[in-house]
């Protein structure tokens, strides 16, 4: 179907498509200078992805060795607000499973497919335009947020495969009970919705979650969930669970990438130039190929 064939090229477009300026910037900022160093920017972005992908894997694998950081997190009230909010959202959606199904299951398949295709096209294009704007204007932050969103979408989709296998929930079309877990099904969580929310999170975060960006982009991502429910392929809690997974994965990688930027002395697949200081006590090691960059 169109919606399944569309998504892989759309993710690829995050890296390949150029041109276009986000509307929020067009209204609030003067025209950005046009960058003429596309080749250098693409090379820089490839190194950014490679360096952070390696560092992300290292951070996740070694996380059990840094439980002291978890202790600090547990003393932060914001942690409990986030966990409580996520739990309330999922619990509420689970309670509404049957109600939402009764209202959406009668949706025609053509309408449901249209909602899904609109969601795929708009969210993926928004992320691609953000990356294209970064190329056009030389805004590395825009490109990095788009690339991180793409990474989040890909990793969250892989995690979703494991969640489906672990919970085995039957789809609404397979069982009228929304508690039919561990029956070899693949309903929980939605693999279609997960990457949409991961991409939407990157766009929203680039604009500091400003409401006039966040509400439209997350609403467009949610259209995919409504389309899936219209096709009787998912429960409402499958959609909300997928949204939490997608957003959470992108937010995690954005956080980790900020930490990597603040620690330039760690191992890099591609060496990076250390930050310039006002003294003469700085020395850089920047060999070609695989290496390490240090800053004193």
Give the residues covered by each predicted segment.
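Extended ligand-binding clefts on enzyme/binding-domain cores
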Residues: 132
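Membrane interface segments of multi-pass transport proteins and intramembrane proteases
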Residues: 102-111
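Alpha-helical transmembrane segments
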Residues: 82-87
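Short coil/turn segments at secondary-structure boundaries
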Residues: 99-103, 176
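Alpha-helical transmembrane segments of multi-pass membrane proteins
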Residues: 89-98
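Residue-level signal for short amphipathic helical patches enriched in basic/charged
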Residues: 52, 95, 106-107, 210
């Amino acid at each position: 179907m169109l919606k399944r064939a569309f998504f892989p090229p759309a993710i690829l477009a995050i890296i390949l498509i150029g041109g276009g300026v986000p509307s929020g910037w067009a209204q609030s900022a003067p025209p950005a200078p046009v960058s003429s160093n596309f080749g250098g920017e693409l090379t820089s972005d490839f190194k950014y992805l490679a360096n952070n992908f390696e560092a992300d894997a290292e951070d996740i694998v070694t996380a059990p060795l840094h439980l002291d950081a978890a202790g600090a997190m547990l003393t932060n009230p914001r942690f409990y607000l986030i966990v409580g909010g996520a739990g309330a959202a999922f619990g509420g959606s689970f309670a509404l499973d049957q109600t939402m199904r009764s209202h959406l299951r009668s949706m025609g398949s053509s309408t449901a497919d249209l909602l899904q295709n609109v969601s795929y096209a708009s969210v993926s294009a928004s992320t691609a335009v953000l990356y294209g704007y970064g190329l056009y204007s030389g805004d590395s932050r825009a490109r990095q947020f788009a690339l991180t969103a793409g990474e989040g979408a890909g990793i969250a989709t892989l995690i979703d495969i494991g969640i489906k296998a672990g919970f085995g929930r039957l789809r609404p079309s397979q069982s009228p009970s929304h508690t039919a877990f561990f029956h070899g099904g693949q309903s929980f969580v939605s693999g279609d919705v997960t990457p949409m929310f991961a991409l939407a999170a990157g766009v929203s975060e680039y604009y500091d979650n400003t409401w006039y960006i966040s509400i439209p982009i997350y609403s467009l991502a949610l259209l995919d969930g409504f389309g899936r429910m219209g096709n009787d392929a998912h429960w409402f809690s499958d959609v909300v669970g997928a949204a939490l997974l997608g957003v959470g994965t992108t937010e995690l990688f954005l956080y980790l990438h900020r930490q990597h930027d603040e620690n330039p002395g760690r191992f890099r697949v591609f060496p990076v130039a250390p930050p310039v200081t006002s003294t003469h006590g700085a020395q850089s090691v920047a060999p070609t190929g695989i290496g390490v960059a240090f800053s004193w």
